[in-house]
Amino acid sequence: MNAPAEARRQLDELLGGLRESLGVDLVGLYVHGSLALGCFNAARSDVDVIALTARALADDERFAVVDLFLRVSARPYGAEAHVVAREHLRPWRYPPPYDLHYSEAHRERLLDPDAVLARPQDGDPDLALHYDVTRRAGVALHGPPPDDVFREVPRADLEDALRRDFEWCRSAKSVLYGVLSPCRVWAALTTRELHSKATGGEWALARLPPELRPPVERALTSYAGAGEPVELDEADRQRLLAHIERALAATPAMSQPGPA
């Protein structure tokens, strides 16, 4: 795994803190996302991890783990973390259940003790995508190899999660989620291969008509660079999304035979 020194330090702190808080009940800690896929960008990427535990967290453990995430995240890179127990993986359920979710978007909410103690009532479709990346490309910082832990996600559930992601992207304004994520969904559903935002954007660029390429070209340049702001014309973005939507409508379901 090619990671900046600061990201490695954050991962070491997360692993050390989880070991201290959970002891032998920490089964594994797995890196997924851009670090695992080799497209981490220090200007905009998060440190994505899944912590696997032997059982659901007790109340005092929830406070300790959230405090750890609050201390480590955004110093300097944001942390995106799910805590899942073994019981959440077997039997398979969709959307996948989980015990705790942290991201910088949840930082303020998790300063409230009641929010820390609240057990999630619904699953998270995004976890199906995270499990797929982790199984196929993830890095185990602690615990068994990823493909020994995470079973193959049923194709129908993977497709549903990808299509939900596309729908969510409609209202996203950022380069990552408003342009490159829809391209990644298109590439993943068409090729049935693992794609990052970067590879999805490149794949889409080779298949788009010339008039729809500029938003993707600008997004890829920014994504690969220092996070330079990109001016996106919303009308151009909506035309891009409409084209991808038409392509997705003609794409066979993942449960059907794939491309030869």
Which residues does each predicted region cover?
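Helical scaffold of the NTase/Pol beta-like nucleotidyltransferase catalytic core
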Residues: M1-Y30, D60-R62, S255-A260
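A generic structural motif
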Residues: N2, T53-L57, W186-L189
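Catalytic metal-binding acidic patch
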Residues: L29-F69, G78-A85
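Conserved NTP/Mg2+-binding pocket subregion across the NTase superfamily
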Residues: D67-A172, V179
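Hydrophobic alpha-helical packing segments in soluble, helical-rich domains
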Residues: R163-A198
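Amphipathic alpha-helical interaction surfaces
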Residues: V185-A188, R192, P210, A250-A253
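Short, charged amphipathic alpha-helical segments flanked by flexible coils
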Residues: E193-S222
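Terminal (often C-terminal) interaction modules
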Residues: T221-A260
